[in-house]
């Protein structure tokens, strides 16, 4: 068999590995690169129509985001994933397609003035829907036959609802070789989902290394910590605004908030309202509720057996339309607002920041990683002033963070996972980590007696009865990037402008069916703004 490493090698997004074995050609993940891009991903070395099937570890876009493009370009095989992953991909790939369409539309409006050739979106809603029709949901822990000589099993890896490590048994001639692809390995003791499953045997392992050189901070009692934040904020008469990732983190927060209300941990404000103001988060929450309870951890299943919905918070209110969203801030009752995006770069959260950042009685609570250059990172690092929608906003609200919340295993967790094999694999291929992190994790594994390496994008390896042989080293081609503080600032600000444009398009769609008088006024305001800046 032959393996080609196509993406997320010496970087953390754009996961893709191609296998050619037992007369079949197939992919493990086909993700989109996001954020900082260091090394060029390799294009598929064959036509998409020549791919027989795809196996998906979990629903995050950096593992699935190019599936609509694959379908657009002629792929017609099956996409295998766990049942919850199939459901989540149904909403996340469509959301990604909306973004692709908007970005192409924006570029064409800009390019038209300079006579540039029109550009097409990377893929469309129709492409996303075509990809979704190719999915086939499989059960955890069930060994399935994919083709003659190829069998697979998906086991829960505790990263996200539906996430899996994939065990592969490949038989060529009289030799059967077992490969294990870790997927993103989860953190221990996350609410709702199970801890990672440990696998006992493999010949070759392909494992992620996101936190391969560091451990997480000690984990506080999140329920107690959150209750303290709510108590002091509500006592001041303020709101707690939570920028939250739509899938996974929002549902964790609902779990904590339900427990806080159930135990009466916030005194004098027991019936405080909780708002979800994110269409994607609302859809994801519905999927969590509809998922087979066997996918949940023991504590969550115990609640369900008692008739308790673990993410149903008394006083929960769902904001659907833009009018619903606006009404949240007209009500001065102290409340919790969960809204996307988690790093404050786009979405309805920016409106909630505009209405709450300047109020010293309010709190902005961060519950996830904030990348360098994002508004969320700026607020956490401390700033007195931000600009939202062209308006300067003083930062007077309390800014705080629940530390240690991560869906990824840290260094100790990764080592615990790989050391669970009863016999050391013949080789560990380290993937899905930043450049130096992968190298350091290879060194750590080597010190512990493993044979390990970290291939670059484009590397090819042959695996047979005699072992693994490198056929091609891969390329260390770095993506050209603008350098300098000014360039980075310009790129960040322009991304904010693009995000604002995406939001405007969504608001327009939400107003479909409104009164003609209101729609005409809205159109006039947009045209006036365009006239001002179309120069």
Give each language-model segment a name.
Residues 1-55, 60, 64, 71-252, ...:
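His/Asp/Glu-rich metal-coordinating catalytic cores
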Residues 100-105, 292-305, 387, 469-495:
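A polyampholytic, Gly/Pro-enriched intrinsically disordered region
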Residues 150-154, 287-295, 415, 465-476:
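Short, surface-exposed amphipathic charged segments that create phosphate/polyanion-binding patches used
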Residues 229-374, 386-387, 422, 437-439, ...:
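Hard-cation-handling environments
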Residues 52, 203, 335, 362, ...:
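Conserved acidic residues
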Residues 191-206, 293-300, 370-396:
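Short, compositionally biased "basic patch" segments
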Residues 387-418:
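Generic long, charged, amphipathic alpha-helical segments
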Residues 458-521:
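Charged, amphipathic alpha-helical linkers/stalks
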């Amino acid at each position: 068999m032959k393996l080609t490493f196509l993406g997320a090698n010496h970087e953390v997004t754009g996961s893709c590995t191609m296998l050619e074995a037992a007369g079949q050609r197939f992919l493990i993940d086909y993700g989109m690169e996001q954020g900082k891009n260091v090394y060029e991903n390799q294009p598929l070395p064959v036509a998409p129509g020549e791919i027989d099937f795809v196996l998906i570890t979990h629903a995050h876009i950096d593992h699935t985001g190019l599936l609509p493009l694959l379908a657009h370009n002629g792929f017609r095989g099956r996409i295998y994933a766990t049942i919850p992953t199939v459901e989540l991909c149904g909403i996340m790939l469509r959301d990604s397609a909306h973004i692709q369409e908007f970005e192409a539309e924006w570029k064409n409006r800009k390019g038209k003035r300079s006579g540039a050739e029109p550009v097409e979106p990377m893929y469309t809603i129709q492409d996303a829907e075509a990809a979704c029709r190719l999915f086939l949901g499989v059960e955890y822990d069930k060994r399935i036959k994919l083709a003659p000589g190829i069998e697979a099993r998906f086991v829960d890896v505790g990263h996200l609802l539906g996430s899996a490590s994939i065990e592969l048994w490949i038989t060529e001639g009289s030799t059967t070789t077992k490969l294990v692809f870790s997927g993103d390995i989860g953190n221990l003791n996350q609410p709702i989902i199970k801890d990672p499953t440990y696998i006992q045997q493999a010949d070759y392992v392909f494992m992620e290394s996101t936190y391969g050189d560091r451990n997480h901070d000690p984990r506080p009692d999140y329920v107690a910590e959150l209750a303290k934040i709510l108590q002091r904020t509500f006592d001041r008469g303020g709101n707690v605004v939570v920028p939250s990732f739509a899938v996974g983190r929002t549902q964790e927060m609902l779990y904590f908030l339900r427990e806080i209300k159930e135990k009466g941990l916030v005194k004098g404000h027991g019936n405080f309202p909780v708002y979800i103001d994110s269409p994607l988060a609302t859809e994801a929450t519905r999927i969590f509720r509809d998922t087979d309870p066997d996918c949940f951890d023991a504590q969550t299943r115990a609640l369900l057996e008692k008739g308790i919905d673990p993410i149903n918070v008394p006083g929960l209110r769902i904001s659907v339309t833009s009018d619903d969203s606006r009404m949240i801030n007209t009500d001065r009752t102290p409340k919790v607002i969960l809204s996307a995006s988690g790093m404050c770069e786009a979405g309805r959260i920016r409106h909630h920041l505009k209405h709450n950042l300047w109020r010293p009685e309010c709190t902005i609570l961060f519950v996830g990683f904030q990348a360098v250059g994002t508004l969320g990172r700026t607020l956490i690092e401390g700033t007195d002033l931000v600009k939202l929608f062209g308006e300067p906003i003083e930062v007077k609200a309390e800014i705080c963070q629940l530390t240690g919340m991560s869906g990824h295993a840290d260094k100790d967790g990764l080592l615990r996972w790989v050391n669970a094999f009863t016999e050391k694999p013949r080789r560990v291929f380290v993937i899905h980590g930043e450049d130096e992190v992968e190298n350091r994790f290879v060194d750590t594994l080597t010190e512990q007696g493993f044979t390990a390496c970290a291939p670059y994008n484009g590397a090819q390896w042959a695996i047979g009865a005699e072992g693994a042989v490198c056929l091609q080293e891969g390329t260390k081609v770095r993506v050209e990037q603008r350098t300098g503080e000014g360039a980075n600032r310009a790129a960040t600000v322009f991304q904010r402008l693009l995000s604002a444009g995406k939001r405007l398009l969504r608001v327009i769609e939400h107003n479909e069916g409104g009164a003609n008088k209101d729609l005409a006024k809205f159109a006039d305001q947009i045209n006036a703004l365009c006239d001002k800046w179309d120069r």
